[in-house]
Amino acid sequence: MAFFKKLKEKLFKSSSKLDEGLDAIIEDGGVEETIEAPDVPLDDENAKAILPEPEPEPEPEPEPEPEPEPEPEPEPEPEPEPEPEPEPEPEPEPEIAAQTPAPKAGLLDRLLGRGETKTVVRRELDDDMLEQLEELLIQSDMGVDTALRVTANMAEGRFGKRMSAQEIKQLLTEEVARIMEPVAKPMPLYATKPQVVLVVGVNGSGKTTTIGKLASQFKAAGKSVVIAAGDTFRAAAVEQLQVWGDRAGVPVLTAPEGSDPASLAFDAMTKAQADGADLLMIDTAGRLQNRQDLMEELAKIVRVIRKKDPDAPHNTLLVLDATTGQNALSQVETFKKLADVSGLIMTKLDGTAKGGVLVALADKFGLPIHAIGVGEQIDDLAPFDPEDFAKALTGLE
């Protein structure tokens, strides 16, 4: 629940854009309607709040015990007559209130829920409204195909009906959650030791930070982890992993800058096996400007670690930057060809107004989404929850 609150706060760019856009669509051509509360009798609990409580019956007083007869007292001397008390002055009459309060609803009306009305703007779900919805979803980076499919599903059985902004948001939330539900899967953990996790992604996607967060979380869960800083051409990536490793108490294997990443992966695999580590996480380069070199590099890493374990890597995670929008789709296409991608992690959802790209990815590729990130802290990376994400995206309360 804490992460959902954080997600909702940090997805304010996307949610406010969709939220305000949906409100504007309903306002444009909508008509204000008066809603009267239904005549439904209140339940016992609410009726008690309205009805006066009956006064409790007084308990019978206990009979007094017989008192002993008093001894005869001597006759007192006669007292002087008291002086007459002065007559009290008459109290001034209270002033009449200047305004008479508005009459409250009668008890019967209150019991039946009458007397309370409110207004709501509703608009007919027609072709014009659907077109506006499609444009809004495309602007949020859901993509044309996904936006058309979502609006078509929203209109099914509801075309021609009058709908409020809240009802449209509820519908959109349900449709987004329906698309995301099948892909919301945590990263699988296996009995194999070490479980090799190959992490790929373009430079700047948050790949290195994600490895550090995952390693820290696995270590906190009682797993032993080894990290291989396989992006040997970027000194900053190696240093960043070393910082995360020191913070989490996870060993980080490094190699001289520009050295062979496959050789480092082999050494890391040897150490992880010798130590009986649960997980080996291997960072990789992300230089998409030279795809041929990258493809050969990744293929070599896989060949080398398979000499140690024919089933490795057991997971290949693609880390994506949400701020790249529709470019994330082309990155998935590319890395699916370069490596056998088994799952996605989406980072930087706190910095984009186009969180709908995650819906497009789920709709187009159907790859498992293991986690999403909304910040720099360790707990800002959390398992993907489709309902929480859908509510945060649409701004639904």
Model-derived regions: residue spans:
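P-loop/Walker A NTP-binding module and the surrounding RecA-like catalytic core of P-loop NTPases
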Residues: D145, T173-E397
